[in-house]
Amino acid sequence: MQPKSISLLQKIDSIIETIIVKFTNIFENLQDANKTTEILSMESLAMENNCIQIIRLCQDLISISRNLKEIWVLNSIKVTQEKFEWKQEEIDIMFTQFNLLTDKIAEFETDMNKE
């Protein structure tokens, strides 16, 4: 495996582990019901902080996923070095596929922003 792949997998594992730790912290704070107002306010602040960090970590995972998809798609469309004449029909098909792909990506991003 390439060093880039290993470091990417380590980063993903690290992000997932951190998300699990943050969720665990949130659930641990919810267990004891007999707490003073001061402790509840401190735990509420800590819980809000954990939630914000979880959201940011999930955004990092989404970014990694998107980058991998872009690399996969762009590497699958290789252009040869030869002088090759494209037929207009082939060009139209390629543009149609590319436009469809960008529309789906934009639709996906719009759906993600609504949530």
From Swiss-Prot:
Disulfide bonds: none
GO CC, alphabetical: mediator complex
Pfam families xrefs: Med22
Gene Ontology BP, a term: regulation of transcription by RNA polymerase II
Localization, UniProt: Nucleus
Main localization of the protein described in the UniProt heading: nucleus
Role of this protein: Component of the Mediator complex, a coactivator involved in the regulated transcription of nearly all RNA polymerase II-dependent genes. Mediator functions as a bridge to convey information from gene-specific regulatory proteins to the basal RNA polymerase II transcription machinery. Mediator is recruited to promoters by direct interactions with regulatory proteins and serves as a scaffold for the assembly of a functional preinitiation complex with RNA polymerase II and the general transcription factors.
Quaternary structure and partners: Component of the Mediator complex.
Family: Belongs to the Mediator complex subunit 22 family.
The protein's name: Mediator of RNA polymerase II transcription subunit 22
Gene expressing this chain: SRB6
